[in-house]
Amino acid sequence: LDVMSHVTSQPLLRTYVIYDSKWFKNYGKVVTDSLVKYIIPIDYSIGLIMISYTDGEYCRKMMKHIEEGTQLEAIYESLKEIFPDDKIEKRPKYLRNEYWETGAVYWNRGADSEKMSKFMMKPSKSHNLFICGDSFSENQAWTDGAIYNAREVSKLIN
């Protein structure tokens, strides 16, 4: 079974900022269709927020802004569209990007993910080889996919 031809890896980018104003104090996690994609507050008391969590196409767009030196402007414009009534600082006092070229793995269209996920847990009948993690799970790119997969593999081992 050629599982590797049925998955594709995508880049992942998380952008963290600290704002003095804490303008986001009344919001929880926000999911958008804008450039920033996901907005996840981390510590309201110090103004820390994951202002952008992107993968794939959105990640590549954001990386282009980073390369061109326009990331902060692009983020600010996205935020003003999402939160038009909030007073958002144009420049946070802190910014950090975390990039992974192979950040997430996804099943390709047409892949029998259930069958392949089960197969990958123990891909060899003649060797004690076990594979677990989110990459070949039914819930890829999320910790709970890895945890579920690890539990299923542990049942095979015991």
Where are these regions (language model features)?
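Conserved flavin/dinucleotide-binding core of flavoenzymes
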Residues: 11, 27-29, 33-158
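Central helical "cap/lid" subdomain
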Residues: 1-27
